Structures are given as C-alpha cells and as structure tokens.
Regions:
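Short active-site segment of divalent metal-dependent hydrolases/proteases
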Residues: 17, 158-159
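Phosphate-coordination/substrate-recognition cap region in phosphate-metabolizing enzymes
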Residues: 2-4, 43-109
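Acidic, low-complexity terminal tails and accessory targeting/binding regions
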Residues: 1-8, 88-103, 143-148, 165-217
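General small-molecule cofactor/ligand-binding pocket signal
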Residues: 10, 80-82, 197
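Loop-to-helix element that buttresses phosphate recognition and phosphoryl-transfer chemistry
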Residues: 13-70, 121-135
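Short, basic/glycine-rich phosphate-binding loops at helix/coil junctions
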Residues: 21-24, 107-121
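Short basic (Lys/Arg) and small-residue
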Residues: 155
C-alpha cells in the first residue's frame, strides 16, 4: 500500500539555453534562456495555470530562475533560489564548448568519458560531490512541505542526482535518466516514502497530451 499522500513535487529542467547549439559545459556559468527556452516555460505556465502550488524553487542561476518566473507569474509566486541547487561545477571548463575543451585541455575529454561520474575538471566537482551538495537541500525543501504541492526548476545533472537518489540508482548509472530541456518529472511522497510517478520528455509537453494531463493531476 502506498499510504497517505504527502508532498508532491513537479521537478523541471530549465528551458533551452542561449548557447545550446554549441553543446557547452555551462555548470555555474550563468547563461540565459534562448527564445525557444522562454517559449517552453511560457507554454508550461499556460498548462499549469489551473493548478495550485504552495511554493516555487530554483537554483540561483538565471536559466532556472527565469524558467521558474514564467510559472511564478501565473501562480503569483516568486522563485525561492538556492545556490545548492546549481548544476555540477565544471571548473576551468565553465562556459566552454566541447571543441574548445578538446583544444585547450588535450586528452581531458577522453579521460572524462572513461568515468563521467568521477571525473573532475580542474576547480570543478564530481557527481558524488554534486550529490552531497544537492540532496540535503532537496530533503530540506521536502520537509518544509509535508502536505503541499510544489515546483522545483533545476538542472539536468541536479535532476538526475535527485531521481537517482530516490530510485537508489548508483551514481555512475544516473546518465540513463533522460532530461531534455524543459522536461517534467513528478515525485509523490506517501507517508514520507517517495514514488517517482513520471519522468518527462520535452517533446511531450502539449495541452493536448493526455500523458501530461495525467502526470500533473
């Protein structure tokens, strides 16, 4: 039995970024949304306008904060931001494209591909370090809302770490979880036990999609 419903979280990845076509290591680099990224969350705001949410959270980087603000404007909520919810830090790679990293740091991309979870760029983080930063803040937010429906807008790596933690997926396997720009994930707690009800895909978000309507209800 699932037990009594508690906190319900709509966990989004931010919208498409202004430099998305370059495939960059954004990390803590504070890039904004592209026009498409803005439209993605204008669309989500329209879809969710009949829903009611207690609070709205994001990282303090503009790509998540601005994404959250589109929903917040419809809901009358201002995003509460936390630096702990930032993406993995890529250190000296921050803001660089894959080709720039390959030119500037020969051989490091190959090293990263051998073990993405544990690779650490100079001045950056590993995924276990990201997990150690994110999960306590996530659990703190959940504890604040034992019976509320809330929204979180985070990053691809952050969402994978959260979902992997809830599903007991080893950290080196979390990349099996797909997180497109503007993806929706739904987490429902029952007597303090989390159930991941939905792992989303950006291609699915449309008011006509029954799957989305079911997921947010």
């Amino acid at each position: 039995m699932k037990g009594k419903p508690g906190c319900r979280i709509l966990l989004f990845r931010h919208g498409e970024t202004a430099n998305s076509k370059e495939v960059c290591f954004n990390g803590h680099y504070d890039v904004g949304l592209s026009k498409r990224g803005q439209k993605q969350f204008q669309h989500w705001a329209e879809i969710l306008k009949q829903e009611s949410f207690k609070s709205l959270y994001s990282s303090d980087l503009q790509r998540t904060r601005n994404s959250a603000q589109f929903i917040g404007q419809q809901q009358g909520l201002e995003p509460v931001t936390f630096s702990e919810l930032r993406e993995l830090s890529f250190g000296t790679w921050e803001g660089m494209s894959v080709s720039e990293v390959e030119r500037t740091y020969p051989g490091q991309m190959k090293e990263r591909m051998k073990s993405v979870a544990t690779f650490q760029a100079d001045g950056g983080e590993t995924y276990p370090q990201l997990q150690a930063r994110v999960i306590p803040k996530f659990e703190e937010i959940v504890a604040r809302h034992p019976n509320d429906q809330i929204i979180m807008v985070c990053h691809g790596g952050v969402n994978r770490v959260i979902l992997g933690h809830l599903l007991s997926i080893p950290i080196d396997k979390i990349f099996r979880i797909n997180q497109d720009y503007a993806a929706l994930n739904v987490i429902q707690y029952y007597d303090h036990e989390p159930v991941v009800e939905y792992i989303g895909n950006a291609e699915l978000f449309s008011p006509e999609k029954d799957e989305i309507k079911t997921a947010i209800q």
